[in-house]
């Protein structure tokens, strides 16, 4: 009775230039959710300001460099706004690190030059007008080069649309308001702020799903290329 032995075939091909991305993706996902939680918290404070109503002494910023003393609710809003800023910085650091990795991996997998030069991973977020499409473009290009022929997930476009909407209608691309000005807006017209916060929370959640989808597609492609084939003999 003969025994059947498993004999390894030729070694699987190696893909040079790949960078580990799973841990970066997990950290980025949690950072996105943390940033979303920060916007939920700030929305709660904006509702509290709106329901409390503006004090008889007027808004905190009274013009011509004059600022009245803040009450306790306004002081706490400053703290919440600071915490939101911290979560956004943390999220930006992890997100850009993840973008670099998926972009580099897409080059390693496709052996093609990326559509956008490396400096756009940073500058694409801060240059006016360019920041309306380049970050999404970098991710979309990395996805298409990683898994050619596969349709771009709808969550990529949904995430980006929500991000741009939230920034444009709230405190980002159009408005450059201080915390005192935001307090004044919460007193006099809170709804645009709440729409912005809701969009940013939705962008954080869809961003979390987007990072998972892009990373999963890339890691599946890597696994299919580097799997060790075996033959029975």
Where are the language model's segments positioned?
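Membrane-interface extramembranous regions at the lipid-water interface
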Residues: 2-73, 94-123, 130-164, 169, ...
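Membrane-interface transmembrane-helix boundary segments in multi-pass integral membrane proteins
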Residues: 188-198
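Generic signal for short, ordered secondary-structure residues
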Residues: 81, 85, 105-106, 190
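Alpha-helical transmembrane segments of integral membrane proteins
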Residues: 84-91, 196, 200
């Amino acid at each position: 009775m003969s025994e059947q032995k498993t004999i390894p075939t030729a070694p699987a091909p190696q893909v040079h230039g790949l960078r580990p991305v799973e841990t970066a993706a997990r950290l980025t996902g949690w950072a996105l959710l943390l940033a979303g939680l920060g916007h939920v918290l700030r929305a709660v404070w904006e509702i509290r300001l709106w329901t409390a109503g503006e004090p008889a002494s007027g808004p905190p910023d009274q013009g011509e460099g004059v600022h009245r003393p803040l009450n306790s609710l306004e002081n706490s809003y400053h703290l919440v706004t600071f915490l939101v800023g911290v979560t956004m910085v943390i999220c930006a650091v992890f997100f850009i690190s993840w973008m670099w990795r998926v972009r580099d991996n897409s080059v390693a997998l496709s052996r093609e030059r990326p559509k956008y030069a490396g400096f756009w991973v940073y500058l694409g977020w801060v240059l006016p007008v360019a920041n309306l499409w380049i970050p999404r473009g970098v991710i979309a290009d990395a996805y298409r080069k990683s898994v050619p022929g596969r349709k771009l997930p709808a969550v990529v476009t949904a995430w980006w649309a929500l991000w741009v909407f939230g920034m444009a209608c709230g405190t980002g691309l159009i408005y450059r308001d201080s915390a005192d000005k935001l307090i004044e807006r919460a007193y006099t017209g809170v709804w645009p702020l709440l729409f912005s916060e809701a969009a940013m929370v939705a962008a954080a959640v869809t961003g979390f799903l987007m990072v998972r989808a892009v990373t999963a597609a890339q890691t599946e492609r890597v696994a299919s290329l580097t799997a060790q084939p075996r033959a029975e003999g």
